[in-house]
UniProtKB/Swiss-Prot annotation:
One of its GO terms (biological process) is signal transduction. Its EC number is 3.1.3.16. PROSITE patterns: PPM_1, PPM_2. It catalyses: O-phospho-L-seryl-[protein] + H2O = L-seryl-[protein] + phosphate; O-phospho-L-threonyl-[protein] + H2O = L-threonyl-[protein] + phosphate. GO terms for molecular function: metal ion binding; protein serine/threonine phosphatase activity. It comes from the Eukaryota. Mn(2+) 2 binds at residues 120, 294, 337. This is Probable protein phosphatase 2C 47. Binds 2 magnesium or manganese ions per subunit. It is an enzyme of class 3 (hydrolase). Keywords: Hydrolase, Magnesium, Manganese, Metal-binding, Protein phosphatase. Residues 76-346 form the PPM-type phosphatase domain. It comes from Oryza sativa subsp. japonica.
Length: 389
């Protein structure tokens, strides 16, 4: 049980066995191999189930092993953006690996702490650029943003409430800023890490994908017309879907800005800025998080993206290079949009490839074993080799 956190509220200023292998060719080599062979070793991977909380209740979540509770994420990240085939670049992103250091001593939060955001603009760059400049202010200058050194349910819920307020306040600010076109809007995908907790908030069709032992775990849902629950909400609020577009105009059903499509503040609107949340407690099984705009996901699956990044980390261990490789793959697959990717690593290194597909299950480690020869087996092998001669 995690110690209860003391939650305070304070305004915060923003700163920007090696294993032995031998092929015997003769009796002498067999004897030599037996003499230096290590004792029998069998490596077994034990799966750890982690509660996946967010829109669903955390009640009844499976327990977590002691080893999992001792895990501390080792955070590092890389990003890459490309204009793609478009004439203008409308994406923006934020990448802060050490949030506590970035905000200074006035913010008390569980460590390690980090913040990331991807903003995919439409109708011009205005809205996305505004979010890049002001997202930190909306989030962390909130007087009700919780401050605590430990994570408990109260703290997590308070952080979620603060992020929700930040999305909605930013949306209203876009309406009030006379320098921003009312037809300009942006999707918003953010990820907060505090301690071992990962909290993802999403409004729009950017996507966050967690790699858990090689398996893609989607940490957000695309707010598009093919999302059944969104279609129901749109219809209930007086909107409609035509040819895959909200009111025949916009490809997403949630976004910040786009005030030419929204009703006045307080009125029900088919297009909303309300984010959806997903959260999980990170363990040693959670290797990295991919955050990308829809230009990535239009041409590849979440699992494909995870496989590319995982292979890259094993080869060169550079998250920024992995982000670039993912963007280049999307261009090779002829994406039609701008491209932005952030790769956030939670472990210091992946090491050599050990997790292979076993019995149709990706991400399950293949057991390895090392064997030594008994004296009797050695004699039998010697006799067999001599007879074979």
């Amino acid at each position: 049980m995690v110690a209860e956190a003391e939650v305070m509220h304070q305004p915060v200023p923003v700163l920007e066995v090696p294993y032995h292998r031998c092929v015997a060719k003769g009796v002498e080599e067999v004897a030599a191999a037996a003499a230096v062979a290590p004792p029998p070793v069998v490596e077994v991977e034990v799966a750890v189930q982690v509660p996946h909380m967010g829109l669903e209740s955390a009640a009844g979540a499976p327990s977590i092993s002691v080893d999992a509770l001792q895990f501390v994420p080792s955070i590092r990240s890389g990003s890459f953006a490309d204009i793609g085939p478009r004439r203008y670049m409308e994406d923006e992103h934020i990448r802060i690996d050490d949030l506590s250091a970035h905000l200074g001593s006035l913010l008390v939060c569980p460590l390690p702490s980090a913040f990331y955001g991807v903003f995919d603009g439409h109708g011009g760059l205005d809205a996305a650029a505004y979010m890049k400049r002001h997202a930190m202010r909306f989030l962390f200058e909130d007087s009700e943003f919780p401050q605590a050194s430990q994570v408990d349910e109260t703290y997590v819920q308070s952080v979620e409430n603060s992020v929700r307020r930040a999305f909605l306040q930013a949306d209203l600010a876009l309406a009030d800023d006379l320098d921003i076109s009312r037809s300009s809007g942006t999707t918003a995908l953010t990820a907060l890490v505090f301690g071992r907790q990962l909290l993802v908030a999403n409004a729009g069709d950017c996507r966050a994908v967690l790699c858990r032992r090689g398996v893609a775990m989607e940490m957000s849902r695309d707010h598009r017309a093919n999302y059944a629950e969104e279609c129901e909400r749109v219809a209930a609020s007086g909107g409609y879907i035509e040819d895959g577009y909200l009111n025949g105009v916009l490809s997403v059903t949630r976004a910040l800005g786009d005030w030419d499509m929204k009703m006045p503040d307080g009125s029900i609107s088919p297009l909303i800025a309300e984010p959806e949340f997903r959260q999980t407690m990170l363990t040693e099984d959670d290797e990295f998080l991919i955050m990308g705009c829809d230009g990535i996901w239009d041409v590849m699956t979440s699992q494909h993206a995870v496989s590319i990044v995982r292979r890259g980390l094993r080869q060169h261990d550079d998250p920024e290079r992995c982000a670039r490789e993912l963007v280049m793959e999307a261009k090779r697959l002829e994406t039609a949009d701008n491209l932005t990717v952030i790769v956030v690593c939670f472990v210091s290194e992946l090491g050599s490839p050990r997790q292979e597909q076993v019995g149709g299950q990706a991400g399950v480690a293949r057991p390895r074993s090392c064997k030594s020869l008994s004296a009797e087996a050695l004699c039998n092998l010697r006799s067999w080799l001599e007879t074979d001669r």
